[in-house]
UniProtKB/Swiss-Prot annotation:
GO terms for biological process: proton motive force-driven plasma membrane ATP synthesis. Keywords: ATP synthesis, Hydrogen ion transport, Ion transport, Transport. Pfam families: ATP-synt_ab (PF00006), ATP-synt_ab_N (PF02874), ATP-synt_VA_C (PF22919). InterPro entries: ATP-synt_VA_C, ATPase_a/bsu_AS, ATPase_F1/V1/A1_a/bsu_N, ATPase_F1/V1/A1_a/bsu_nucl-bd, P-loop_NTPase, V-ATPase_su_B/beta. Produces ATP from ADP in the presence of a proton gradient across the membrane. The V-type beta chain is a regulatory subunit. The keyword Ion transport applies. It comes from the Bacteria. Belongs to the ATPase alpha/beta chains family. NCBIfam families: PRK04196.1 (NF003235). This is V-type ATP synthase beta chain. GO terms for molecular function: ATP binding; proton-transporting ATP synthase activity, rotational mechanism.
Length: 461
């Protein structure tokens, strides 16, 4: 039986960090309990060890800590999450404690929140379609099981509504396999938290969801643990309970701000924009926990959502996220201001695995050709619109005017489906054909004749 030593040698507190002296047999990432003079228990984690000193990161903040009267205990293990299949349908705080008024979980086991490194050889290739019910994603930027596909948003854009829509509607097509949503919120307001919980409750989606809520008034340092706790729950459900799990994490910008706060408190040499130089490595320890494993039925699919500071896609957070993940969904202020919901800008958006989750047997044989044709037609339509601004509409040819008509209807009917319309992939593909029929058949050069004969509507639009 291991003996837990108690220390009263805290020597310094700087922001979210505490220095404990005269320690021995302490390890990196070890869980720490700090008992305050009033009996309150706070938790932390060992960040660094030098000789007989340990630097502890405090999850609940350092306010009210009396160094002389505080008792520090090192648990002998890393921060762990109590997991059970009964987590599904429950709401937890950012540290994994129930906050929905329900009973405490009876844990099946305790898992290290940092997870286990996945051997690349044991990974299975993502190739199965996930239907979100959103045409701009399902058809043009297809999401597949095991993928990590981030949403790049901006200040004031409705990324929360988009996240809630995906959480409500996402499903595995033509399958009776278990599907679950793990939702991790970091630094959101009380109103936003209420919005998410109410949206999932009123549609019944809460029954297949696990929510972890770190609010804006919770300690910023807790945000470093929240996504790891959520991913630990997702891995448990996926690889031990054979469920297909979609993990939605919002807002990753708040997570990175918490990392910067800890880095500044440690007096580390800052990197780009003041973020720590290891930001890329740290983000990869989250994003790379998505995937499928050979011999396992379950999968973990990630949709991280981040707000780009000043709408700058070259900012370190979206920039590094783009390097690690497999594409991006970009929200547009221009589309939002025109009243389109969700305001997904499909031209710069990308899913690098979209060709792996589409086609006969997965969606439909005309998926990829119509996707390519819609992209080409919309891009041409936007060019023609710019030309009309410079030269006037009178300078446009008859075909150019059809492209303008196509673009207008594409934005109004295809992109602008609303946050509460759930379109299955059949309806999305059929709508795509209806819009393409606006253009002359001679312009549809990316679709083979046999598909044109089969699907192109015969009536004039």
């Amino acid at each position: 039986m291991s003996v837990i030593k108690e220390y009263r040698t805290a020597s310094e507190v700087v922001g979210p960090l505490m220095i404990v002296e005269q320690v021995n047999n302490v390890s990196y990432n070890e869980l720490v309990e700090i008992q305050l003079h009033n009996g309150e228990i706070r938790r932390g984690q060992v960040l660094e060890i030098h000789e007989d000193k340990a630097m502890v990161q405090l999850f609940e903040g350092s306010s009210g800590i009396n160094l002389e009267k505080s008792k520090i205990r090192f648990a002998g293990h890393a921060l762990e999450l109590a997991v059970s299949e009964d987590m599904v349908g429950r709401i937890f705080n950012g540290m994994g404690k129930p906050i929905d008024g329900g009973p405490d979980l009876i844990p099946e086991k305790y898992l290290d929140i940092d997870g286990q490194a996945i051997n690349p050889v044991s990974r299975d290739y993502p190739d199965e379609f996930i239907q979100t019910g959103i045409s701009s994603i399902d058809h043009l930027n297809t999401l597949v099981r095991g993928q990590k596909l981030p949403v790049f948003s901006g200040s004031g854009l409705p990324h929360n509504e988009l996240a809630a829509q995906i959480a409500r509607q996402a499903t595995v097509l033509n399958s009776d396999e278990n599907f679950a949503v793990v939702f991790a919120a970091m630094g959101i307001t009380f109103e936003e938290a209420e919005f998410f919980m109410e949206e999932l409750r009123k549609t019944g989606a809460i029954d297949r969801s696990v929510l972890f809520m770190n609010l804006a008034n919770d300690p910023a340092i807790e945000r470093i643990a929240t996504p790891r706790i959520a991913l630990t729950a997702a891995e448990y459900l996926a690889f031990e309970k054979d469920m297909h799990v979609l993990v939605i994490m919002t807002d990753m910008t708040n997570y990175c701000e918490a990392l910067r706060e800890v880095s500044a408190a440690r007096r580390e040499v800052p990197g780009r924009r003041g973020y720590p130089g290891y930001l890329y490595t740290n983000l990869s320890t989250l994003y790379e926990r998505a995937g499928r494993l050979v011999g396992k039925k379950g999968s973990v699919t990630q949709i991280p959502i981040l707000t780009m500071p000043e709408d700058d896609i070259t900012h370190p957070i979206p920039d590094l996220t783009g390097y690690i993940t497999e594409g991006q969904i970009i929200l547009s202020h221009e589309l939002y201001n025109q009243g389109y919901r969700p305001p997904i800008n499909v031209l710069p958006s990308l899913s690098r695995l979209k060709d792996k989750g589409s086609g006969e047997g997965k969606t439909r044989g005309d998926h990829a050709p119509t996707m390519n044709q819609l992209f080409a037609a919309y891009a041409q339509g936007k060019k023609v619109e710019e030309l009309a601004v410079v030269l006037g509409e009178s300078a446009l040819s008859d075909v150019d005017k059809l492209y303008v008509r196509f673009t207008k209807r594409f934005e109004e009917e295809y992109i602008n489906q609303g946050f509460y319309k759930n379109r299955n992939i059949e309806d999305t593909l059929n709508l795509g054909w209806e819009l393409l029929s606006i253009l002359p058949r001679t312009e549809l050069k990316r679709i083979k004749d046999d598909l044109l004969d089969k699907y192109l509507p015969l009536v004039e639009v």
